[in-house]
UniProtKB/Swiss-Prot annotation:
It holds the Pfam family RNA_pol_Rpb1_5. Its EC number is 2.7.7.6. This is DNA-directed RNA polymerase subunit Rpo1C. Residues 1-123 are annotated as: Unknown. Residues 124-508 are annotated as: DNA-directed RNA polymerase subunit Rpo1C. One of its GO terms (biological process) is DNA-templated transcription. It comes from Thermoplasma volcanium (strain ATCC 51530 / DSM 4299 / JCM 9571 / NBRC 15438 / GSS1). Part of the RNA polymerase complex. The keyword Isomerase does not apply. Signal peptide: none annotated. GO terms for molecular function: DNA binding; DNA-directed RNA polymerase activity. Its main location: cytoplasm. Belongs to the RNA polymerase beta' chain family. DNA-dependent RNA polymerase (RNAP) catalyzes the transcription of DNA into RNA using the four ribonucleoside triphosphates as substrates. Forms part of the jaw domain.
């Protein structure tokens, strides 16, 4: 297929004229039958079906892409406006295309969708028989427990097997939460009590300055508050199996990941008298970041409204409009000017882990979307501690698992053991609406349907005043609002109505 950049005006004209002949300023190989068109170099919004290709000739019924330099004529049979497709889905000669300037012969990557295995296919008929026998006794037992029972069935004998099966069913039944139990209160107490023993500390990567990871109580607060940006965002990046033991590839990936700006590799000197800015490269820093003089110069040439000169290895930049304000703004712009790397990744280090001596990359800063698009990175194992970013890139179910894993790991690092079911409840409540919501007045607690429950949490007068203006009605269906008005709560025994059936009166 062929992909090319075109104007929205041309595509609109083509859409009204198909089938039509379209003359373009590049050579289209014969045999091309389809193409995608972009107008912003990054996203493709049109799909075209091409019936034939011919060299350009001056014909009257041909729509022209531009007035001169035309080389080929495509006979376009059909054109369709589509949902935007990222340029990252296309490859040219096996390589990723970062930006499309004119055109390219490319192929589009497609995901292989495999059929999901049915649950029964994974489980042997003998295990299913054990589960069925337990159901006859009135108990539901997990598959893993049924497998363990089956392994020991011959050792126990038939009589003991049935006794143990019944006993296990009773134990599982006893472990189930009671109907109408206040699970939220239990979860809050079970997480909060050991949480008081947590320390407020930050882990520092040895030998690397400015490489810290927040742990303990501050990290737990970040998780339940659903902070948009964690205090110390970081990523754990795994490479594909064929690359993770190759030292050269790993170091190359590290350098490509680190976001390098001009201020990281050069000194910036402002001359107020001459109204110029001198960029003085530091050879040691440039070698460390695998950047050469051309990379630096090309980055500075992207700045608009300036004159760039090179003298004795230094780069002199002068604004075309001479003013102190312009000079100051230009200085700040050049300092932050990116040269290479991925936005958001401030630092990256590689460490050898495990008996097999496989490299793992750790970063300061996070950009999950762009990191996953690096060819050498294994997208199935790479991880970030930024939960909101996970929700944006991978979806709400992945964010739910991330909340659970991060909270569990934070507690375990402090030597605290909290039943995973309490953490699962918190993760479910934070994500069940389809977006990550905080446990607080800006999230779950602030969006309750009950006016009194919202007012009891925080900003009492604001909630009561707003409810009065809007004419809201509180049906007293929850816990907090019933406590406020002095009624029994709708949990535990308060959720059950007792029905008394009297004895019939007997005649004396």
């Amino acid at each position: 297929m062929i992909i090319w950049k075109d104007t929205a005006k041309n595509m609109s004209l083509l859409s009204k004229s198909v089938p039509a002949k379209y003359a373009v300023d590049f050579e289209v190989p014969k045999g091309i039958t389809e193409g995608y068109v972009t107008s912003d170099k990054k996203r493709f919004t049109y799909h075209v079906s091409i019936s034939s290709v011919a060299p350009y000739s001056n014909e009257s019924d041909v729509i022209q892409k531009k007035k001169s330099g035309l080389k080929s004529i495509m006979e376009i049979e059909k054109i369709q406006k589509i949902e935007p497709i990222s340029i990252m889905e296309f490859r040219s000669s096996g390589k990723r295309i970062d930006e499309l300037l004119t055109y390219a012969i490319a192929e589009r990557e497609t995901a292989e969708i495999r059929e999901k295995y049915e649950y029964e296919k994974k489980v042997s008929s003998q295990v299913l028989d054990v589960i069925a026998e337990a159901k006859k006794l009135g108990y539901n037992i997990p598959e893993s427990v049924a497998e363990e029972i089956l392994r020991r069935k011959e050792e126990w004998g038939e009589k003991k097997y049935r006794e143990i099966l019944k006993r296990i069913g009773e134990e599982i039944q006893d472990e189930l939460i009671d109907p109408y139990e206040a699970v939220g209160i239990i979860a809050a107490q079970s997480i909060g009590e050991p949480g008081t023993q947590m320390t407020m500390r930050t882990f520092h990567f040895a030998g690397v300055r400015e490489m810290n990871v927040t742990l303990g109580l501050p990290r737990l607060i970040e998780i339940v508050d659903a902070r948009r940006i964690p205090s110390t965002p970081s990523m754990t990046i795994y490479l594909k199996p064929e690359f993770e033991t190759n030292d050269e590839v790993v170091m190359d990936v590290v350098k490509r990941l680190e976001n390098t700006s001009v201020s990281d590799v050069a000194d910036i000197i402002t001359d107020i008298g001459e109204l110029t800015i001198t960029v003085r490269p530091d050879p040691n820093k440039m070698n460390d970041r695998l950047i050469n003089q051309d990379d630096l110069v090309n980055a500075i040439y992207k700045v608009k409204g300036v004159t760039v000169m090179e003298e004795s290895g230094q780069i002199i930049v002068k604004p075309q409009q001479e003013s102190f304000k312009k000079l100051y703004l230009l200085q700040e712009q050049i300092k932050a000017l990116p040269i290479k790397g991925i936005s958001g990744i401030k630092r990256a280090i590689a460490r050898v882990e495990g008996k097999e001596h496989r490299w793992v990359i750790y970063t300061q800063g996070s950009n999950l979307k762009d990191v996953l698009e690096v060819d050498e990175v294994d997208p199935t194992r790479t991880y970030t501690n930024d939960i909101v970013e996970i929700a944006t890139v991978l979806g709400i179910e992945a964010a739910r698992n991330a909340i659970l894993n991060e909270a569990q790991r934070t507690l375990q690092e402090q030597g605290l053991n909290v039943d995973v079911r309490h953490l699962m409840l918190v993760a479910d409540m934070m994500t069940f609406s389809g977006s990550v919501r905080a446990v607080g007045r800006t999230g779950i607690s602030g969006r309750k349907s009950s006016v009194l429950a919202r007012a009891a949490f925080e900003i009492t007068t604001k909630h009561l005043l707003r409810a009065g203006i809007m004419g809201e009605v509180d049906k007293l269906a929850g816990v907090a609002e019933n406590i406020i008005v002095g009624q029994p709560i709708t949990l535990g025994t308060g959720a059950v109505d007792i029905i008394y059936k009297g004895y019939p009166k007997t005649k004396k």
